[in-house]
Amino acid sequence: MEERELISSNQMREEAKLEAIKQNGYAIRYIDNPSEEIQLKVVRQNGYTISCIKNPSEQVQLEAIRQDGCAIEYINNPSSYIKSIIDVLDTSNRRIYVLHEPNNEPLFTVGCQCNITKNDFIWRIYNLDGGLEENPYRQEYLDIIERY
């Protein structure tokens, strides 16, 4: 079987599909019509794998951005609810993603720091890479945090 050949639902049992995506989440692109259960497992491992899923449900979209806010960039048509709970903010040096679900604390994705709490973000601003004194963008980050 060619590596890029689609694997039909009849050819591969659900357990085998689960094992394939467990090994490598991007293998979902070779599974024809993966179930929502499989889609959820994949995006919970790696939010970026949503790029391999055609027409993901709102729940799959939500799980992808909960895993990594940057995943919003890989959703072709995010639902209106998804658009309403994530802000994409461009700063002088990078993009910041803020996930603000109702009744939950906002979560920030900044660079490789995925879905960190407000307190974690503030701690990083003051303590990493020399703090406010050595990084001119830190004040910009604090200004963003104040909005949430």
Where are these regions (language model features)?
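Alpha-helical scaffold segments
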Residues: M1-L128, L132-E133, Y137, Y141
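Mixed-charge, Lys/Arg-enriched low-complexity segments
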Residues: L142-Y148
